[in-house]
Amino acid sequence: MDKLENWNYGSAPSFPYGDETTYRKAIAFLDGPWTIEDWGCGTAWAKRFVERGQYVGVDGSWSLHCDVVADLRTYRSDAGGILIRHILEHNNDWRRILENALESFRQRFVLVIFTPFGDVTRSIGSTKERVPDLSFRKEDLLDFLRPFHFTEESLQTATQYGVEHLLYVT
């Protein structure tokens, strides 16, 4: 089964994945007079927090919440802001997705990771659909961000692993 088929929301109502704190923080940073793409938008919960920008939901599965159906491993765009929240952790091809996002954003980018950092990037669990939960060696992610200006924040949140890491990139 293709990973893109694992989360098919169709006409399901919008709902958040875990604590909405990081949706709010990410959109507060991204919101500006430009397009904000939410890569792996799911049910587009982040959209409700956009006040200034034009929200575009990008996902691998069609739903009423998705504006663009795309495989993030090959997708590139030209967006003022990009949000990737709780996506890289489920993708063994996370490097390709991160590279594409870094090539595509023009103003701001936020990466939100919900798994704890570890000594090595590896799977620490999986969903019932056998999609991995990757824990990252922090340096593996930061190596991609070093050419940019970025700040980071870690929060204890009501999510599966009790933590979320936000990387704010300009």
PLM regions: where:
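Conserved N-terminal segment of class I S-adenosyl-L-methionine
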Residues: M1-D78, L134, Y161-L166
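Activation segment
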Residues: R76, N91-N92
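A conserved beta-strand element that flanks and buttresses the S-adenosyl-L-methionine
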Residues: L83
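Short catalytic micro-motifs in class I SAM-dependent methyltransferases
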Residues: H86-H90
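S-adenosyl-L-methionine-dependent methyltransferase catalytic module, highlighting the catalytic core
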Residues: N92-T170
